[in-house]
Structure formats: structure tokens, C-alpha cells
């Protein structure tokens, strides 16, 4: 009885240590993993045990075509884990990349003091002249400060995918908006005319929502609006529709602005602009760079997607581990006499363990590469939309980066490590005489 409980305790401790080791393995950066791989390669080539491990591994790998059906369970299972994990994380990374690419370090966004987003910010019209006279701002050829008082209105518009109504953002901007937002470029049509109900739509909005083609009219706020142009920015503004701020305010009875975007004279100009605003007691406002502001807007959603992706990947990984364990235990049982023969002619326990581990890791590597390739081919650049902090749809693309593919491979090799270790230990401990008698 005591021996039985001791074995259970040892097994439990082994599982806990293995889980800790697996988590540490997945967290390791490539700068540390490459030296580990190099040391393993040197050990395999230089030492006698390493060369015996390679020789035994070649024997096992040569028999893979004969048991490809069972081996494919490992490859397909791990490919599924890596594919789902990379796809989920690519969604979060793509969303964050879109927000991080919005704005720059020399463009300032001004919000009401304490406001975290435009939705709960109010800037009265009488503050605009005060802000426009602050030092540090860039000016146009006529010496006018480059700033754009803006307000955003959430409107309902039909989705192209299924026709259901979704939230889209109609942004009212000032006449200097095109000089302030330098990433926004007109690609079709013309700019809207101030005072008229005309809109220019972002390329992302055009691809995601119905009725935004050039020349089309749509009803917003019980008024008819005409699409006169299409712009592209490659950032969060691609999801928006732009119009004249005063026209939008009149249509929706908006008496104040929500934000002011201003172009400053580089980073020194921004610092001067921010200091001057803080020093003016009439301006109870917060100012930040547009890059920093938009970058913070997606932090919560990106973290949520990353957590969900990791949890789902971990659950699937457990299934893949059991699949690998089952396959490798079956392989050990089938090759019991072969393994016993190798041990009888001089292959000690360590080369046998390493040979089976190398075999499993090879299958895991194939699964990881397959899963990563599928995720990249299917999801990289795939365009979707989600609800942003302004309660409107933000259009973005999945981004399958080399870092995500590397993480997927680490997960695959970690699953292979766990799935191959215990069968390999069993093979090394199997009595030679018992194994040789098995048919």
C-alpha cells in the first residue's frame, strides 16, 4: 500500500514538474532556445550516446511510413492546436496593430480632463480659439494653425456580410482635417463640401458596409447624405465616414465638440503645446499624442483575445498530448521486440529515450509547420470588424507575424516533448527478456 501511494506521489510530482517545464519552455525567447538547440545538436554529433541516439532515431523514422495512420494523429492534432492558437492571437495582434498605426507622435488629441475616450468627452466651442493660439502648433502656408475640432456620431448601417444593422462611426471634422491627419489620403472622388450633407468613406468601411459606393445616397439622422469620395489611411480611420463637423452638429443637434486633433511642430512642438495647455487655468483638458491615445484603446480587447486564445489552445493541447501519448505508447508496444533487440546489442537507456523523443518531436514539428502554414494561408490579411471603444465597428486585418508562428512551433514542440517522454521512459525500462518474448 505504501509503495502504491509512493508511486502515485512520484507520478503526480512528475506531472507538476513537467507542466512547469512546459510553461517555461513556451515562455522562452528564441534567443535562448537557439543556444539550447545548438547544444543538443553538438551532443548528438560529438558524444557516443548522441550518435547512438541518432542511429536509433533513424531506424524509428524509417518505419514511419508503415505506421503513418497512427503517426498522423500526432501531426493533425498538433496542427489543429497551432492553427487555432495562431489564428486567435493573430486577431488580437491585427486589431492592436491597426490602432498602433493610427496617428503619430507629432499629432495631438485633446479631450476633456479625465476622459478616457471621445465618447465621454465634451469640449465647448469657446475653447477652440484658445487652443488654436497655444504655442507649438504647426501652421499652413497662410499661417493658420493646423487643428481639427471633431465629433463622432454612431450610426446604424447594414453589414455587407449578412445585412444586419451594425454600428458605424460618422466623424465630423474641421476644414484643416486633411492637413492634420496626414495618413488619410483621398483615393476616389473628392473631398466633401462644408455645409453640404456629403460624406467621404474609409476604404475599410466601404468593404464592410452596404450602400457606401461612390455616388450612393444614404439616410442618416433622417437626412439624405451623398457619398462623394473614398479615402485610405491604413489605420483605425479606415473604418469611419467623414463629413463636415458643423453639418453633422446641425443634423444631430450637437452643441459641442468631443475632441480636437492638432498637428504640432514635431516632438518638441508637442511638448511645448502640452506644457502651455497645462499652464492655462481656463483649459481643463487632457492632451496626448494620437499614437499613444489609439494604442491604449485596444489594450483590453487585445488582452482578452490573447487570454481566450491561450486558454482554448491549452485545452486543445491537452487533447493533442493524449493523442500523442496514445500513439507513442502503441508504437512502443508494437516495436517492443525491436527496442529490446537494440538494447541487447548495446543501445543503453538514454539513446533509446532520445531516439523516441526525436521521433515524436519530428512529428510535432511537422504538425506545427502544417498548422502555422494553414493559419498563415487562411487568416493572414483576412479582414473583419469588431466593436471598438467608441461603440462602433473597427475594421482590421488578421496579422500572422513571424513571432506568432514561432510561438506556435514552441507549443508544437512542447506537446511533442510531453507526448513522447513517458512512452520513451517506458521503453527504456521494459525488461529485455520480457520484450523479446512478445510477439
Stretch-by-stretch model annotation:
Residues 1-15, 37-82:
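N-terminal Sec/SRP start-transfer signal
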Residues 11-35, 369-410, 421, 425-430, ...:
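Short helix-loop junctions at transmembrane helix boundaries
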Residues 4-21, 95, 269-322, 331-333, ...:
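Peri-transmembrane interface segments
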Residues 329, 337-383, 407-415, 423:
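Transmembrane alpha-helical interface segments in multi-pass membrane proteins
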Residues 158-165, 210-309:
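Mechanotransmission and gating elements of multispan inner-membrane complexes involved in transport
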Residues 79-169, 188-190, 195, 250, ...:
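Hydrophobic, regular-secondary-structure patches
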Residues 68-95, 302-338, 361-370, 414, ...:
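Hydrophobic alpha-helical transmembrane segments of multi-pass inner-membrane transport and secretion
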Residues 164-208:
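Short beta-strand boundary microenvironments
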Amino acid at each position: 500500500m505504501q509503495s502504491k501511494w509512493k508511486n502515485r506521489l512520484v507520478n503526480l510530482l512528475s506531472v507538476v514538474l513537467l507542466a512547469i517545464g512546459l510553461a517555461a519552455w513556451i515562455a522562452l525567447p528564441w534567443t535562448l532556445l537557439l543556444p539550447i538547440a545548438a547544444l543538443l545538436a553538438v551532443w548528438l554529433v560529438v558524444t557516443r550516446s548522441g550518435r547512438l541516439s541518432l542511429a536509433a532515431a533513424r531506424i524509428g523514422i524509417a518505419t514511419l511510413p508503415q505506421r503513418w495512420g497512427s503517426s498522423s494523429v500526432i501531426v493533425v492534432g498538433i496542427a489543429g492546436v497551432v492553427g487555432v492558437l495562431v489564428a486567435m492571437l493573430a486577431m488580437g495582434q491585427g486589431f492592436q496593430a491597426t490602432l498602433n498605426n493610427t496617428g503619430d507622435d507629432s499629432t495631438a488629441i485633446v479631450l476633456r480632463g479625465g476622459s478616457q475616450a471621445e465618447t465621454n468627452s465634451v469640449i465647448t466651442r469657446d475653447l477652440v480659439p484658445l487652443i488654436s493660439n497655444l504655442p507649438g502648433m504647426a501652421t499652413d502656408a497662410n499661417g493658420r494653425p493646423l487643428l481639427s475640432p471633431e465629433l463622432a456620431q454612431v450610426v446604424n448601417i447594414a453589414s455587407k456580410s449578412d445585412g444586419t444593422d451594425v454600428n458605424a462611426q460618422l466623424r465630423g471634422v474641421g476644414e484643416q482635417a486633411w492637413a492634420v491627419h496626414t495618413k488619410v489620403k483621398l483615393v476616389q472622388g473628392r473631398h466633401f463640401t462644408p455645409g453640404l450633407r456629403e460624406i467621404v468613406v474609409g476604404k475599410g468601411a466601404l468593404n464592410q458596409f452596404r450602400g457606401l459606393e461612390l455616388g450612393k445616397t444614404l439616410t442618416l439622422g433622417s437626412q439624405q447624405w451623398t457619398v462623394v469620395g473614398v479615402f485610405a489611411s491604413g489605420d483605425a480611420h479606415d473604418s469611419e465616414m467623414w463629413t463636415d463637423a458643423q453639418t453633422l452638429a446641425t443634423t444631430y443637434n450637437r452643441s459641442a465638440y468631443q475632441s480636437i486633433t492638432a498637428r504640432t511642430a514635431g516632438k518638441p512642438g508637442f511638448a511645448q503645446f502640452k506644457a502651455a495647455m497645462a499652464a492655462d487655468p481656463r483649459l481643463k483638458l487632457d492632451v496626448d499624442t494620437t499614437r499613444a491615445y489609439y494604442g491604449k484603446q485596444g489594450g483590453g480587447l487585445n488582452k482578452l483575445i490573447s487570454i481566450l486564445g491561450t486558454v482554448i489552445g491549452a485545452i486543445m493541447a491537452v487533447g493533442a498530448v493524449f493523442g500523442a501519448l496514445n500513439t507513442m505508447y502503441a508504437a512502443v508496444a508494437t516495436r517492443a521486440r525491436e527496442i529490446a533487440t537494440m538494447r541487447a546489442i548495446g543501445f543503453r537507456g538514454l539513446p533509446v529515450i532520445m531516439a523516441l523523443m526525436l521521433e515524436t518531436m519530428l512529428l510535432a514539428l511537422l504538425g506545427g509547420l502544417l498548422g502555422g502554414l494553414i493559419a498563415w494561408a487562411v487568416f493572414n490579411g483576412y479582414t473583419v470588424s469588431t466593436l471598438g471603444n467608441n461603440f462602433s465597428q473597427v475594421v482590421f486585418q488578421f496579422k500572422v507575424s513571424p513571432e506568432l508562428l514561432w510561438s506556435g512551433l514552441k507549443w508544437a514542440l512542447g506537446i511533442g516533448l510531453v507526448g513522447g517522454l513517458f512512452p520513451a521512459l517506458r521503453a527504456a525500462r521494459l525488461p529485455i527478456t520480457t520484450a523479446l518474448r512478445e510477439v
